[in-house]
Amino acid sequence: RRVLFRSQAVINEAHSRGLVVPDRVRGKEGETQAAGAYVAYPKKGLHEWIGSMDLNSLYPSVIRALNMSPETIVGQIRQDRTKDMIRNGMASGMSFAECWEGKFACLEYDIVMNQDIGEDIIIDWENGKSQQVSGKEAYDIIFLNGQSLMLSANGTIFTYETKGVIPGLLERWYAERKDLQKKAKTAGDSKEFEFWDKRQLVKKINLNSAYGALLNAGSRSEEHTSELQSRGLISYAV
């Protein structure tokens, strides 16, 4: 039921914008498994000045920050180097997760963010065109040409000219939760506090479970969001 609720919420959000939601195309089981999140390995030993932080609604915040939604994808950097790295690692006996040890993003993302002039990458645009450029040129195209583009750690390029359906839905839920939290704080008695507190908790669960629900095989959006997840920052978190 939770999966159906979140899937229907996305559909309703799209319809409210006058958008048509594609029919679901059923694939074979196991074709679209989601990768696990990025986990940094601890550095053993005694350390000074240790700190920690807890990002507010991490996955929803990442989706909103990069405007991640299937309809906002405008390009994808080919992951040739990254695929070779994984293929070679697994051939040597490493697991898929072990191939990613110590890495936050795909190798091509690092080339772009380091503005490497000696390494070329290929960008496949949604309009069917492909473009071979250096890391520096790709950085300029994405961040410096005023094209309202964002780049995820897996090399997916999103536009933020218009707000995506999924980020827009999460933004509304987030605002609604904040409003419910305010009502809980100003409640006149414990019964009223409990009423509003439970409602804000429901919103919190909706926000934090949306990522997994949209990737669930029972979700109508699964075949679209699994592609998004496999290419997006939320695979490895921030």
Enumerate the language-model features and the residues they cover.
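Short "domain-exit" segments at the C-terminal end of structured domains
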Residues: 227-238
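Conserved acidic
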Residues: 1-226
